[in-house]
C-alpha cells in the first residue's frame, strides 16, 4: 500500500482542526464589540478555556469571569477569570459548583452591563444547575447515552431538568445584556440545542420531551414527570448571538487540505447523522467503487454519528466508523479515517481512527476479528493493535467530526502472454528487449514472452 496515505491523513486532520480553532474565531466575533458598562465573562464547553483566553486578550480585561471546561482542558491562568474543570459527558459535583460560581457572578448586574457568554460543545454536561437530584440526572444521562438517543433528543430532555438550560441562564442574567459567541457542534447549528441553549429561546416543547421518554422507555421519578409539564422560555429580549465556527468550516478545511495534497475532494455531506458502523461501511464502499480510476480522490463527510452500545469494550464513534470501513477497502490503495474536532472520541485518549487496505490483514495476523471488535464496541484496542489510532490531544475546539475516504492513484496492470514462436523475433527487433513495459497515462502494459 502507498505509505504516504497515513501521512496524508495526519496532515489533513491537522489542517482541518487548525482551521476551526476558537482563537481567531473569537477575535473576529469581538471585532465590533464595544460594551458600555461592566463586562463579565462566562465560558462553558470543551473549548471554553481557549475561547476565554482569546476574548481576554482582545478586550484587555474583564470585570470577572468563570470558565468551566472538561478535565485536563485548562491550559493556564487567565487574568480576572476563575478556571474550573468538571465532568463530561456526565455532569459531576464540579460541574454544579462551577455553574453556581457563574450564577453568582451575573447577579446584581445593571442594564448597561454585559455578560460575554462563550459557548462550545460539551456545555450541556459542564454547565449545569440540576432541578433534580444529581443521582437522577446522572442516571438519565447514562440511559440516554446507552440507548442511542441523538444529541437533539438528549438536550431536549436535559432542558426540562435544568435551571440554566433552555434560555434560563439568560433570564438569570437580566437586566444585563448577554452577548453569546458560539462554536456549533450540532448539525444545522440549532442555537437552542447547542449546549442545550442556556442563552437562547427554546424551540423544543414538553410534548416532544415526553415523546422521547416514551420512545426510549426512560424511567422517570414523580419529580421529573412534574418538570416535564413546565415549559422553557420561548422569547428572550436581552440576548445577541453569533456563531463563529461549525462543521461546515471543518469540512471546507478538510477539502482544502486534500486538494493541497493532490487529491480531488468531493464533499458528500456536512449533515452526517447515522450509525457509526453504517457510515464507515458506506465510505468504505465508495472507496472500493471508485478505486482503480487512476485518480487521487477524497470523499469527505462531516457531522456526528451515533453508537449503540452492545458490548463492554472501549472506543468511540470515530474509531468505530473507521474500523467498520476496513473490510470494504481491504487490499486497496485507500484509507478511511474519522476524527472528532475536539481531540476526544468516547472515553479514550484518541481523537479517532484510521484504516487502510492493509488493516484487515494486520488485524487477522494479530489474532483480531474486526467484526468481533465492533460487536464488543472495542474499536480502540483493535485499532491500537495495528497503529490505527489518531491521537491529537485536546484541541480546544469542538465542531463535530469529519471523516474522509482517501483513494490513491493505482496502476492497472494488464499482462499478455504471447507465443514466442510467432512474435519473439519481431518484437525483439522492434523493442530491443525480451520484456518491456510501456506506460500510458496510469495504465501499465506488461508483455511477457514465453
Per-region residue spans from a language model:
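Glycine-rich oxoanion-binding loops at beta->alpha junctions
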Residues: 69-112, 152-153, 157-158
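Gly/Ser/Thr-rich active-site loops/lids in small-molecule metabolic enzymes
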Residues: 130-151, 202-217, 311-337
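Accessory alpha-helical/coil subdomains and C-terminal extensions
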Residues: 176-179, 201-282, 286
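A glycine/threonine-rich phosphate-anchoring loop and its flanking beta-alpha core
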Residues: 151-213, 217
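Internal helix-turn-beta structural module
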Residues: 323-410
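Glycine/threonine-rich beta-strand-loop-alpha-helix active-site module
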Residues: 67, 71, 75, 79-82, ...
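An N-terminal, well-structured beta->alpha segment
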Residues: 1-42, 50-51
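A glycine- and small-aliphatic-rich helix-loop capping segment at beta-alpha/alpha-beta transitions
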Residues: 54-64, 80-82, 103, 107, ...
Amino acid at each position: 500500500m502507498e505509505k504516504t496515505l497515513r501521512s496524508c491523513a495526519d496532515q489533513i486532520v491537522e489542517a482541518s482542526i487548525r482551521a476551526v480553532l476558537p482563537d481567531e474565531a473569537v477575535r473576529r466575533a469581538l471585532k465590533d464589540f464595544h460594551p458600555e458598562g461592566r463586562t463579565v465573562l462566562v465560558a462553558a464547553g470543551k473549548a471554553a478555556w481557549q475561547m476565554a483566553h482569546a476574548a481576554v486578550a482582545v478586550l484587555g480585561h474583564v470585570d470577572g469571569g468563570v470558565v468551566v471546561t472538561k478535565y485536563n482542558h485548562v491550559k493556564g491562568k487567565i487574568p480576572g477569570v476563575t478556571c474550573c474543570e468538571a465532568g463530561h459527558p456526565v455532569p459531576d459535583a464540579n460541574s454544579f459548583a462551577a455553574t453556581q460560581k457563574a450564577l453568582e457572578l451575573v447577579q446584581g448586574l445593571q442594564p448597561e452591563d454585559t455578560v460575554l457568554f462563550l459557548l462550545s460543545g460539551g456545555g450541556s454536561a459542564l454547565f449545569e444547575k440540576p432541578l433534580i437530584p444529581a443521582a437522577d440526572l446522572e442516571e438519565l444521562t447514562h440511559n440516554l447515552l446507552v440507548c442511542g438517543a441523538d444529541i437533539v433528543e438528549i438536550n431536549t430532555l436535559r432542558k426540562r431538568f435544568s435551571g440554566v438550560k433552555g434560555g434560563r441562564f439568560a433570564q438569570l442574567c437580566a437586566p444585563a445584556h448577554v452577548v453569546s459567541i458560539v462554536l456549533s457542534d450540532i448539525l444545522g447549528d440549532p442555537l437552542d440545542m447547542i449546549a442545550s441553549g442556556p442563552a437562547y429561546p427554546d424551540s423544543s416543547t414538553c410534548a416532544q420531551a415526553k415523546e422521547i421518554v416514551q420512545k426510549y422507555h426512560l424511567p422517570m421519578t414523580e419529580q421529573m414527570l412534574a418538570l416535564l409539564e413546565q415549559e422553557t422560555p420561548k422569547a428572550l429580549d436581552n440576548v445577541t448571538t453569533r456563531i463563529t465556527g461549525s462543521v461546515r468550516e471543518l469540512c471546507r478545511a478538510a477539502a482544502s487540505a486534500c486538494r493541497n495534497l493532490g487529491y480531488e475532494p468531493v464533499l458528500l455531506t456536512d449533515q452526517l447523522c447515522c450509525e457509526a458502523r453504517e457510515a464507515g461501511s458506506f465510505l468504505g464502499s465508495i472507496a472500493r467503487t471508485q478505486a482503480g480510476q487512476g485518480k487521487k480522490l477524497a470523499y469527505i463527510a462531516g457531522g456526528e454519528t451515533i453508537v449503540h452500545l452492545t458490548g463492554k469494550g472501549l472506543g468511540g464513534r470515530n474509531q468505530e466508523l473507521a474500523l467498520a470501513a476496513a473490510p470494504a477497502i481491504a487490499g486497496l490503495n485507500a484509507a478511511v479515517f474519522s476524527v472528532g474536532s475536539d481531540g476526544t472520541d468516547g472515553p479514550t485518549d484518541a481523537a479517532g481512527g484510521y484504516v487502510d487496505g492493509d488493516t484487515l490483514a494486520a488485524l487477522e495476523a494479530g489474532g483480531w476479528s474486526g467484526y468481533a471488535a465492533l460487536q464488543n464496541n472495542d474499536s480502540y484496542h483493535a485499532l491500537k493493535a495495528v497503529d490505527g489510532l489518531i491521537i491529537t490531544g485536546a484541541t480546544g475546539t469542538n465542531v463535530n467530526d469529519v471523516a474522509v475516504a482517501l483513494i490513491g492513484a493505482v496502476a492497472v496492470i494488464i499482462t499478455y502472454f504471447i507465443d514466442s514462436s510467432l512474435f519473439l523475433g519481431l518484437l525483439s527487433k522492434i523493442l530491443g528487449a525480451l520484456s518491456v513495459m510501456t506506460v500510458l497515462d496510469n495504465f501499465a502494459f506488461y508483455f511477457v514472452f514465453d
